[in-house]
């Protein structure tokens, strides 16, 4: 058995040394030794799964480790630097050997060059600091979903965030075979200023080594760049899943309540600002996870599990009317980290929270007052648009009882959403798995939200709402999704949803809570309890099935006029959409499977035939089952 290296042992306290000796994993010891030689910390602390150790991490965060207490018990706040407020796509790169090509759409750098650069920035970055070593588990414990992970960081805020978001994994590491695979994350915030923020953000790097399942992160504190178990681990998991025949997706998991108290589990992928959280948190439904899901096949069925145990959510516009469950958790005693909000009199405030904000306080820019401007003359908002909350799912009243089931839950239906003002109907079911993956998931577009008033936004392509995190060639990623239904007896139906359809005067055609009716209809379709109308691109609801749901669930009279406007088949716009998406594949995705082009051809032929028969617009009342 390989002993702990002397350079590591001499920096450990007795409790940390005993804990590390219990794990006895040569690959882990080698990773820690390399990190210590590289970053040169003064001390090393290793943390177990115990509540005592988790509390110790929180105390470190509050004792000069990047967080400050708020008046409500358990609540803390954290500020990232003004130039460190979000994920950095430009500085996030894959480290690839010369014989590995992920395609031009993925940001990469030569592995040797990239390792030299990021390790140069990490060299000596923990001098005078304490290195923290934490162990986590992605997916439920004691499960085929479980992936062990180790995080090394000098930021107690990062470690504290992970203790909320992630399942503990130290005991898992103790039982690992010596040759077991695990994910590795090394982070240093680098040199910090008097506010504890990274000074050298221009040298921010987030480099992903797919060969060693390792992520290096330096000169940054924003959780999306530093908390390894979030999107950094998703990139590693997509690569691992591709090798092993399962899926890692940027999806929520929710329980939709059908007749006779039936629960059907849906998964959903939405680009940012397209209704993902509001769907997963619909009143009367249950949530398992809001962000990342793993998928496995067992005995002819598809199962999924939430990778995390918490939420790192955007807090802007969270209010008691639109988000009652989340809002209640955020204003109740319990462990919550608020990042980049406005703080005044020991309370957190954010834009869109449903009350009047103080005119003074502190935020990510320092002392703040209403009307304060930055160096460029722009008014500084009270809270950043990407301000966040970090909370355990167990704090939510609507957590599903199967959330920690090591088997996961069966996938009843799949939803793909986007932001589209003029083309897609509010909900449509694909004809089959192949068309669902290709025409719903692999054809997602989301209009930019900063469009000029009176104009439609510019459609931005975002494959499966996962494009930023795909770590394999996009064509292979599509093929993996297509192949995943192989051996599944009845693949779950796939639906597209669109909550942003507008009329000719740019008024939204659907209400905020109408999405509940769309999902309840989809739940009935999963069980074959309602018929549907056939369009060139899929199945849409009948009016007579929606009207009773609107009345029963929303106490709303649903008119035939509203139905016709919402579910009008916009043939010309659909033809334009699929022309546009196909061109993207031909220009930018050289390994696109031929079945993608064949499917686009079939869909376009059906649309052309429908236009010859009905014209550019098809009323749903002209369609048949």
Model regions and ranges:
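N-terminal accessory targeting/assembly segments
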Residues: 2-182
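Conserved NTP phosphate-binding and transfer environment spanning the P-loop NTPase/kinase superfamily
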Residues: 13, 68-70, 81-82, 87, ...
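Short, glycine-/Ser/Thr-/acidic-enriched flexible segments
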Residues: 51-52, 139-141, 239, 257-261, ...
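Short acidic, glycine/serine/threonine-rich loops at helix termini
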Residues: 56-59, 144-150, 279-282, 298-302, ...
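Extended, Lys/Arg-enriched charged tracts that mediate electrostatic binding to polyanionic substrates
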Residues: 115-145, 218-237, 241, 378-390
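Charged, amphipathic alpha-helical linker segments immediately N-terminal to NTP-binding catalytic cores
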Residues: 177-250
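Catalytic or ion-translocation cores adjacent to nucleophile or general acid/base/metal-coordination motifs
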Residues: 259-345
């Amino acid at each position: 058995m390989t002993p702990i290296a002397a350079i590591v042992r001499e920096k450990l306290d007795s409790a940390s040394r005993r804990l590390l000796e219990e794990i006895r994993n040569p690959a882990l010891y080698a990773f820690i030794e390399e990190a210590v030689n590289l970053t040169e910390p003064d001390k090393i602390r290793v943390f177990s799964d115990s509540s005592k150790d988790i509390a110790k991490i929180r105390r470190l965060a509050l004792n000069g480790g990047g967080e400050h207490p708020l008046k409500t018990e358990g609540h803390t706040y954290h500020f990232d630097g003004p130039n460190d407020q979000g994920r950095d796509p430009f500085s996030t790169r894959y480290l690839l050997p010369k014989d590995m090509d992920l395609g031009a759409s993925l940001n990469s750098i030569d592995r040797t060059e990239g390792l030299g650069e990021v390790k140069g920035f990490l060299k000596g970055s923990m001098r005078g600091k304490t290195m923290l070593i934490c162990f986590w588990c992605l997916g439920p414990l004691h499960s085929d979903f479980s992936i062990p992970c180790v995080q090394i960081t000098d930021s107690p805020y990062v470690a504290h965030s992970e203790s909320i978001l992630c399942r503990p994994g130290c005991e898992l590491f103790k039982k690992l075979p010596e040759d077991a695979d695990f994910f590795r994350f090394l982070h240093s915030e680098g040199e910090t200023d008097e506010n504890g923020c990274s000074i050298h953000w221009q040298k921010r790097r987030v480099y992903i080594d797919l060969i060693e399942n390792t992520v290096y992160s330096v000169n940054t504190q924003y959780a999306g760049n530093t908390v390894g178990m979030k999107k950094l681990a998703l990139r590693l998991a997509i690569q691992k899943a591709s090798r092993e025949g399962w899926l890692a997706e940027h999806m929520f998991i929710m329980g939709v309540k059908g007749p006779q108290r039936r629960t059907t589990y849906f998964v959903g992928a939405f680009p940012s600002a397209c209704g993902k959280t509001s769907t997963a948190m619909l009143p009367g439904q249950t949530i398992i996870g809001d962000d990342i899901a793993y998928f496995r096949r067992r005995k002819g069925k598809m199962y999924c599990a939430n990778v995390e145990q918490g939420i790192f959510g955007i807090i802007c516009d969270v209010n008691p009317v639109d988000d009652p469950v989340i809002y209640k958790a955020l204003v109740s005693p319990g462990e919550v980290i608020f990042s980049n909000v406005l703080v005044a009199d020991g309370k957190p405030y954010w834009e869109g929270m449903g009350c009047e904000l103080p005119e003074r306080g502190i935020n990510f820019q320092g002392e703040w007052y209403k009307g304060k401007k930055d160096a460029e003359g722009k008014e500084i908002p009270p809270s950043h648009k990407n301000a966040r909350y970090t909370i355990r799912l167990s704090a939510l009243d609507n957590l599903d009882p199967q959330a920690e089931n090591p088997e996961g839950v069966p996938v009843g239906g799949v939803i793909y959403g986007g932001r589209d003002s003029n083309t897609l109907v509010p909900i449509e079911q694909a004809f089959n798995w192949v068309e669902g993956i290709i025409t719903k998931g692999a054809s997602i577009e989301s209009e930019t939200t900063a469009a000029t008033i009176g104009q439609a936004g510019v459609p931005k392509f975002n494959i499966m709402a996962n494009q930023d995190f795909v770590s394999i060639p996009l064509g292979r990623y599509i093929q993996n999704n297509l192949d995943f239904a192989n051996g599944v007896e009845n693949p779950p139906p796939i639906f597209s949803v669109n909550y942003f359809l507008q009329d000719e005067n740019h008024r939204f055609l659907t209400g905020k809570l109408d999405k509940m009716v769309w999902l309840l209809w989809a739940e009935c379709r999963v069980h074959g309890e309602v018929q549907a109308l056939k369009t060139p691109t899929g199945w849409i609801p009948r009016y007579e099935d929606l009207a009773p749901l609107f009345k029963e669930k929303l106490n709303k009279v649903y008119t035939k006029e509203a139905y016709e406007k919402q579910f009008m088949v916009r043939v010309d716009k659909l033809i334009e959409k699929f022309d546009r998406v196909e061109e993207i594949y031909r220009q930018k995705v050289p390994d696109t499977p031929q079945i993608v082009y064949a499917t686009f051809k079939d869909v376009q032929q059906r649309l052309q035939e429908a236009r010859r028969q009905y014209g550019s617009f098809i009323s749903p009342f002209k369609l048949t089952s």
